[in-house]
């Protein structure tokens, strides 16, 4: 594959303005005059180089060399029209930026059209940028399990097939029908290990923003193997189920016996409320037991603004989630803790103790994420595990869905609650969902 050099439009303009000779040695006329006849194309170069090229990336600036180029009225790359600027057209040179939109039909040709509707074709390939590998349908998929990788600029050609490399394993040949511009379907190859997935196209190779089978930042795995396993560290005892990932335990928020209103105006405690409040009813509080620690002692939240909260979720088709949002709330021990109010901890903090007022107290206006998956088209997962991700920078809503006025700090990540309530208008519909959750973790966004 040829070596490419990307330049910005502004740089290209600067090249023309300073009269660099790599594209044209003739001064630009004071005024553009269109000509009759048809153009002739001899070759194409980069605007700042004498290197001849037969292909370029989207949004790159190229210089067409030929004759009678003032006759060009329109220029198309495949089926995408480029923008012409007559200030950068002479009889022998035409400077143009390759369109940034993927073609619907790829012909690998440039079409130069005149005002008399005559068209001249020239063979030239437009390449998308290197692929962007943003997320995967299920980060903990087992070998042989089918997953979907999402991103952009996925494509393959007969002479340059798309390749997917899992850590320690190659996914092999990918069928054309399993590839779209923004997704690719693939089976996890045998022997795949934890790490970043790489995807290669004719445009280059990129590593995933996520880590496959990520073992970093684990807060709760609900079986105590690598993370906390409790489902009861507050006032309410959510259930644990044996149907977790890999046959382990997972959290079960069981609304099958409830009737959730669409807007969440009636909150649901008991089996539909997960609380983890740090502390062990000690005085002073030491957070000394495995399941009493502050979450920010387990994971470093110093750079929380560039982190994401992730977990796997499974929603049965016969108990869909069609309304009533979930509040995802981190909090400091000075707002709520597992113990008595007024007790100090070994760090000098005065603890708030157990309470159910901090999360809807307007004077605190604690930021949180309000999750409405049905609004994005997900009311169930067909009983399969999928990975969901919430940028902590998006934790910005108050209890009722309005913008929160409070601020999060690294100390705000001691506790976690998942709570079906409020935060919505009348969108959605009443429901009795069952929501399984596993592997709650906080990791860098990239």
Residues covered by each model-derived region:
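Extracellular carbohydrate-recognition regions
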Residues: 208-255
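Beta-strand acidic-aromatic groove motif in beta-rich domains, primarily in extracellular
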Residues: 318-344
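Extracellular carbohydrate recognition and processing domains
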Residues: 344-406
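Extracellular beta-strand ligand-recognition surfaces/modules
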Residues: 311, 325-327, 331, 385-434
């Amino acid at each position: 594959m040829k070596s490419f050099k990307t330049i910005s439009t502004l740089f290209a303009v600067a090249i023309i303005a300073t009269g660099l000779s790599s594209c044209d040695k003739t001064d630009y006329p004071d005024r553009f005059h269109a000509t009759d006849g048809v153009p002739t194309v001899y070759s194409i170069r980069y605007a700042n180089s004498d290197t001849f090229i037969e292909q370029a990336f989207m949004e790159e600036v190229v210089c067409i060399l030929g004759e009678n180029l003032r006759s060009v009225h329109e220029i198309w790359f495949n089926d995408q029209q480029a923008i012409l600027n007559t200030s950068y057209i002479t009889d022998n040179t035409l400077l143009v930026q390759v369109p940034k939109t993927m073609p619907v039909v790829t012909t690998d040709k440039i079409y130069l059209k005149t005002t008399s509707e005559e068209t001249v074709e020239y063979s030239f390939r437009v390449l998308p940028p290197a692929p962007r590998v943003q997320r995967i349908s299920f980060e903990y998929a087992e070998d042989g399990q089918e997953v979907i990788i999402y991103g952009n600029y996925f494509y393959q050609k007969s002479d340059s097939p798309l390749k997917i490399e899992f850590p320690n394993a190659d996914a092999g040949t990918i069928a054309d029908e399993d590839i779209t511009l923004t997704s690719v379907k693939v089976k996890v190859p045998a022997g795949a290990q934890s790490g970043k997935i790489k995807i290669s196209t004719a445009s280059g190779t990129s590593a995933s923003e996520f880590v496959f089978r990520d073992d970093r930042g684990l807060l709760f795995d609900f079986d105590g193997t690598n993370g906390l396993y409790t489902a009861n560290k507050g006032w309410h005892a959510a259930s644990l189920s044996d149907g977790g990932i890999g046959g382990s335990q997972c959290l079960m928020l069981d609304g099958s016996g409830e009737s959730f209103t669409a807007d969440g105006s009636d909150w649901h405690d008991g089996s539909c409320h997960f609380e983890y409040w740090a502390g062990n009813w000690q005085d002073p509080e030491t957070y000394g037991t495995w399941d009493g620690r502050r979450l920010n002692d387990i994971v470093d939240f110093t750079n929380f603004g560039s982190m994401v909260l992730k977990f796997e979720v499974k929603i049965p088709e016969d108990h869909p989630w069609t309304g009533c949002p979930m509040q995802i709330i981190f909090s400091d021990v000075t707002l709520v803790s597992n113990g008595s109010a007024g007790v100090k901890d070994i760090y000098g903090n005065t603890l708030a103790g157990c309470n159910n007022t901090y999360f809807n107290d307007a004077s605190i206006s604690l930021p949180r994420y309000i999750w409405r998956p049905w609004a994005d088209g997900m009311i169930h997962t067909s009983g399969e595990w999928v990975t969901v991700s919430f940028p902590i920078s998006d934790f910005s809503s108050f209890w009722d869905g309005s913008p929160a006025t409070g601020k999060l700090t690294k100390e705000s990540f001691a506790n976690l609650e998942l709570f079906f309530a409020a935060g919505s208008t009348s969108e959605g519909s009443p429901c009795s969902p069952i929501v399984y959750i596993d592997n709650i973790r906080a990791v860098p966004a990239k």
